[in-house]
UniProtKB/Swiss-Prot annotation:
One example of a Gene Ontology biological process annotation: queuosine biosynthetic process
Family: Belongs to the GTP cyclohydrolase I family. QueF type 1 subfamily.
Pathway info: tRNA modification; tRNA-queuosine biosynthesis
The protein, known as: NADPH-dependent 7-cyano-7-deazaguanine reductase
SUPFAM superfamilies reported for this sequence: Tetrahydrobiopterin biosynthesis enzymes-like
Subcellular location: Cytoplasm
Keyword Cytoplasm: yes
Catalytic activity, as annotated: 7-aminomethyl-7-carbaguanine + 2 NADP(+) = 7-cyano-7-deazaguanine + 2 NADPH + 3 H(+)
InterPro entries from the UniProt entry: GTP-CH-I_C/QueF (IPR043133), NADPH_dep_7-cyano-7-deazaG_red (IPR050084), QueF (IPR029500), QueF_type1 (IPR016856)
Purpose of the protein: Catalyzes the NADPH-dependent reduction of 7-cyano-7-deazaguanine (preQ0) to 7-aminomethyl-7-deazaguanine (preQ1).
Gene that encodes it: queF
Active-site residues from the entry: 31, 38
Top-level division of the source organism's lineage: Bacteria
EC id: 1.7.1.13
Length: 116
């Protein structure tokens, strides 16, 4: 996944802690075992520091996963790593909720907190 796609902009309220929640209910990737499509909802919750994530670039970043054979756990951790690197938030959580396959659903949650 090309993390260079992710753009940020200056946070105009860096001295105030507030939470931003971004939800993508139409995330797609491919199961690396079966080659079948996977569908899920990605929820990103973060407290920005000096910069915020630009949404159009995030949309294009998510499209990088569309044809990639990658496990749920890898997707979730990769997204967190790339977004933390891009915007260096005070804290961030990425939660992925995957649609049922064979009657089983999966949710993966990973978090980051900046060192003080």
């Amino acid at each position: 996944m090309n993390k260079e796609i992710i753009e940020v902009f200056d946070n105009t309220f860096p001295n105030r802690d507030y939470t931003i929640e971004i939800v993508n209910p139409e995330f797609t990737s491919v199961c690396p075992k079966t080659g079948l499509p996977d569908f899920g909802t990605i929820t990103i919750t973060y407290v920005p520091d000096k910069s915020c994530i630009e949404l159009k670039s995030l949309k294009y970043y998510f499209l990088e996963f569309r044809n990639a054979g990658i496990f749920y756990e890898n997707i979730t951790n990769t997204i967190l790593d790339h977004l933390v690197e891009a915007c260096q938030p005070k804290s961030m959580t990425v939660k992925t909720d995957w649609n049922a396959r064979g009657g089983i659903t999966e949710t993966v949650t990973v978090s980051y907190t900046a060192e003080k």
